[in-house]
């Protein structure tokens, strides 16, 4: 495909402008690029071809490749939420071009973007909708003698197959792999062996050896992917050949620094990457295919053990150390666990592998001092999953499966030795106590993670260790000033909080609260987390620290927590804020208006400061959660409103994209609970709501809709002059597949609130608007929303009026809606209020003489009502319910932060029953129907018999 010269120039200019430092120029160009992508036919092909042109600007090429990748990510898979799906012809063209463009890519950056794109396409299309790609890759793999090109081919193959890692073993994955394994393994093994021969032949050729070993690395990654779901029969039959190749690289020796040394302090060397991949493979086979692999296991254990004891403590070796220790841990729990059964072997594992890899390194201490956020992530947030410490702890857990008593005895000796060494010189040997705490944790924990409450082993006395080694450290009795130890102790309490008796909790709090005033980021953050977790512990559903206890000690808890934000590094400490959220929730309704006002003033001031430069989105969310929760209790008080309004005004005036969804929610709470005499304060907001610019951001839609609903309900008939503007908003929303349900929320509120005379002139337009949307893009969601709205309309204004309104648009439309849309959907409606609405509307139709005049329709309605009130589903409805499972919201990762609506979980709008006078829809039906039947006995009784309904 050849691009017109003007298209090339247009795109080049746009992409160059989109890379400019000037914000206005950059944003305008980005907007035009997005418009081009959405509105130009074949835009995905144009982008792909454009980035492959040799003459274009390098920055434009890169941005074009990124735009192509993002378009694939957002629009390749069809679905209700995809507003601009890619035509199937364009998809086929992309798939026919992509591999060649990857191989001919001008630079590594664009090549990487294209490989990522291919991987995403492969997730949905390979192999069923893309059968040509694998034979083409195999052909290239077998015929290509150029090692750099072969490396690219293997990289592509790896990206295509990695989707099977972690995939469930089901019919689809097995069917796909059956096809793949029918054509790939033989040429794959041939290439693996051939590459091994080439490696041996080039032991003195550094440049060629590096290229070959890069290929080996991809080959190993491919092997892992092909083995992840099920053991391929070919692999099982040829395990001897494969394991010979694995041993080749585990035993590989060379002096070439480009192979054995890393390019930086954190990146593993090429050889270590290969050996890590092998450890991951043999771990997988030991874990899942242990019977088939057991005869090959012993030599791997020996060689991996040997490599592990020879590997330095450098950070760059951590992935290998983790993978190798994990492999040994898997062996310890496998059918081959007797490899470790001798006391001497267990002793060596504990003393030579576990304890040394538990020990803090200088790099860990530097991380604590220089990058406390990253240290915390590794230590308590689970991102330490591939560290030496984590691997050592997992190895201990694995060994305990068969050798718990022996391992506890062996490591208890190490723990005592470490504590003795610490006590002999606490200043010099404090790392020993850190190791001891970690070892006790490794021995004591039976389940749970590093940041969660854990079940503990009965063979380890957690409470004794807490009293002898943890509590004194926190209380200051040990007279050491090592912040890492204090952090360890706080984490220990957090992990074993369930094992510490309830009567200890008040004293623990007295030791933990002072840590909130420690300027060390880790310490006051861990203290916040510790308090949060202690507050969460319940016995028989009852919190150990009751709401009454918290209320009594509210000032002593909240003031130090709020004080955390005064520290330079903790102005946005989300863990402290999360703890405050929990306390505010626990004490909801128990805090006086005076304290509420003081807290609101504090948190509103924090948000106003944050609004100047929002950066920590989680912190900001928690802060708004606190304000929203506090606001609920006293939202009708003018003094409270006066505190909140300056924040709302500032956010609206500065057009703060991140905070506006929150502020509209706060406004909604104020309006929903406003006393009539104070409503004038909020009426100036209405013109803002009706301004098109207010609806410029999707993120604001849900909160704006809630706010508009609040005004409609509060104003009642006074809102009628604004109906045209309100319906203009609903028309905009209803045409958006992601926001159509919000249009119906507005329409339902209008119908529930206003009498028919206010709506009369708009009714035809409302139904035409809805039906136009359904005709253009019919989805289950929009039909369900319409079904609920239609039911509310009938209940409020009557069945006859509804029929007249719809027939005024088209005479046959009433029956068409009921038979083709409404009836097939009603039984698939979920939610107690929604089901009640459906049942009431069915009752009203069944008991309507106009409906009775159409016997076939009446029979369908009575059968449907029978199913609704009995809880049954028709066959069609069950099928529709299964189909609805396909409509899954996909949260896409964005390039950079894009504000999205974030619901304040603890200030949600409560679902309100629009028809509270009817408490039981079944009883309502029975009583209403009996009256109707008695008046129409001659007509109803035969129809009931025909419908096979007994009432």
Curated annotation (Swiss-Prot):
Entry keyword annotation includes ATP-binding: no
UniProt subcellular location: Cytoplasm; Nucleus
Principal place of residence: cytoplasm
MF annotations from Gene Ontology: nuclear export signal receptor activity; small GTPase binding
GO cellular component: cytosol; nuclear envelope
Keywords of the record: Cytoplasm, Nucleus, Protein transport, Transport
InterPro entries: ARM-like, ARM-type_fold, Importin-beta_N, XPO2_C, XPO2_central
Protein name as it appears in the record: Exportin-2
């Amino acid at each position: 495909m050849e691009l017109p010269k003007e298209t090339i120039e247009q795109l080049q200019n746009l992409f160059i402008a989109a890379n400019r430092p000037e914000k206005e120029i950059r944003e305008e160009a980005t907007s035009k690029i997005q418009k081009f992508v959405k509105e130009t036919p074949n835009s995905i092909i144009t982008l792909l071809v454009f980035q492959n042109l040799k003459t274009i600007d390098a920055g434009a090429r890169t941005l074009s490749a990124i735009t192509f990748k993002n378009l694939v990510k957002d629009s390749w898979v069809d679905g209700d939420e995809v507003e601009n799906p890619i035509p199937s012809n364009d998809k086929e063209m992309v798939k026919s071009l992509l591999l060649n463009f990857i191989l001919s890519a001008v630079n590594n950056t664009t090549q990487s973007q294209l490989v990522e794109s291919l991987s995403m396409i492969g997730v949905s299309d390979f192999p069923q909708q893309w059968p040509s790609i694998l034979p083409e890759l195999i052909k290239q793999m077998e015929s290509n003698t150029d090692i750099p090109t072969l490396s690219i081919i293997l990289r592509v193959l790896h990206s295509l197959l990695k989707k099977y890692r972690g995939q469930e073993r089901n019919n689809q994955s097995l069917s796909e792999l059956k096809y793949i394994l029918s054509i790939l393994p033989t040429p794959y093994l041939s290439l693996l062996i051939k590459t091994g021969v080439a490696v041996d032949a080039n032991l003195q050729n550094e440049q060629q050896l590096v290229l070959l070993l890069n290929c080996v690395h991809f080959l190993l990654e491919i092997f892992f992917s092909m083995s992840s779901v099920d053991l391929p029969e070919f692999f099982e039959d040829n395990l001897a050949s494969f394991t010979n190749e694995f041993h080749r690289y585990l035993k590989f020796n060379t002096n070439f620094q480009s192979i054995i040394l890393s390019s930086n302090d954190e990146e593993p060397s090429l050889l270590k990457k290969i050996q890590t991949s092998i450890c991951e493979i043999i771990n997988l086979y030991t874990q899942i295919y242990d019977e088939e692999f057991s005869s090959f296991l012993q030599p791997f254990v020996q060689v991996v053990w040997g490599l592990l004891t020879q590997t330095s403590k450098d950070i760059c070796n951590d992935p290998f150390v983790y993978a190798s220790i994990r492999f040994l841990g898997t062996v310890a729990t496998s059918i081959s666990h007797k490899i470790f059964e001798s006391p001497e072997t267990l002793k060596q594992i504990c003393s030579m592998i576990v304890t040394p890899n538990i020990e803090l390194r200088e790099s860990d201490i530097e991380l604590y001092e220089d990058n406390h956020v990253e240290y915390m992530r590794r230590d308590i947030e689970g991102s330490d999953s591939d560290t030496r410490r984590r691997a050592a702890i997992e190895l201990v857990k694995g060994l305990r499966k068969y050798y718990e008593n022996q391992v506890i005895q062996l490591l208890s000796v190490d723990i005592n030795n470490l504590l003795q060494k610490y006590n002999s010189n606490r200043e010099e040997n404090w790392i020993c106590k850190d190791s001891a705490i970690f070892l006790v944790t490794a021995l004591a924990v039976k389940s749970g993670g590093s940041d969660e409450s854990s079940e503990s082993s009965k063979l380890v006395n957690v409470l004794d260790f807490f009293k002898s080694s943890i509590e004194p450290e926190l209380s200051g009795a040990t007279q050491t000033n090592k912040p890492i130890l204090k952090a360890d102790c706080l984490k220990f309490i957090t992990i074993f909080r369930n094992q510490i008796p309830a009567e200890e909790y008040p004293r623990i709090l007295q030791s933990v609260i002072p840590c909130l005033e420690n300027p060390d980021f880790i310490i006051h953050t861990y203290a916040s987390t510790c308090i949060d977790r202690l507050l969460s512990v319940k016995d028989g559903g009852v919190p150990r620290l009751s709401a009454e206890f918290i209320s009594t000690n509210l000032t002593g808890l909240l003031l130090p927590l709020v004080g955390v934000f005064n520290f330079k590094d903790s102005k946005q400490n989300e863990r402290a804020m999360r703890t405050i959220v929990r306390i505010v929730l626990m004490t909801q309704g128990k805090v006086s208006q005076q304290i509420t006002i003081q807290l609101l003033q504090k948190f509103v001031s924090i948000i106003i400061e944050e609004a100047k430069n929002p950066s920590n989105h989680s912190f900001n969310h928690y802060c708004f959660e606190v304000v929203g929760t506090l606001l609920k209790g006293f939202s009708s008080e003018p003094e409270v409103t006066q505190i909140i309004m300056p924040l709302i005004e500032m956010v609206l005036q500065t057009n703060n994209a991140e905070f506006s969804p929150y502020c509209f929610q706060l406004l909604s709470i104020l309006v929903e609970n406003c006393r009539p005499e104070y409503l004038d304060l909020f009426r100036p907001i209405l013109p803002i709501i009706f301004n098109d610019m207010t609806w410029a951001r999707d993120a604001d839609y849900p909160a704006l809709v809630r706010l508009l609903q609040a005004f409609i309900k509060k104003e009642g008939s006074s809102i009628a002059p604004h109906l045209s503007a309100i319906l203009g908003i609903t028309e905009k929303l209803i045409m958006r597949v992601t926001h159509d349900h919000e249009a119906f929320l507005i329409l339902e509120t209008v119908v529930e609130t206003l009498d028919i005379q206010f709506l009369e002139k708009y009714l035809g337009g409302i139904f035409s608007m809805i039906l136009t949307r359904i005709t253009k893009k019919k989805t289950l969601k929009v039909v369900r929303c319409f079904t609920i709205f239609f039911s509310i309309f009938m209940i409020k204004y009557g069945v006859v009026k509804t029929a007249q309104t719809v027939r005024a648009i088209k005479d046959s439309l009433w029956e068409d809606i009921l038979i083709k849309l409404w009836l097939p959907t009603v039984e698939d409606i979920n939610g107690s209020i929604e089901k009640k609405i459906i049942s009431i509307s069915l009752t009203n139709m069944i008991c309507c003489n106009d409906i009775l005049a159409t016997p076939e329709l009446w029979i369908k309605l009575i059968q449907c009502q029978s199913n609704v009130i009995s809880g049954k589903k028709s066959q069609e409805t069950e099928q529709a319910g299964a189909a609805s499972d396909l409509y899954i919201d996909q949260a896409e990762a964005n390039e950079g932060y894009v504000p999205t609506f974030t619901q304040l979980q603890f200030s949600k709008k409560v679902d309100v029953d629009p028809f509270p006078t009817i408490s039981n829809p079944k009883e309502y039906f029975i009583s209403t129907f009996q009256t109707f039947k008695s008046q129409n006995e001659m007509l109803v009784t035969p129809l009931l018999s025909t419908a096979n309904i007994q009432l």
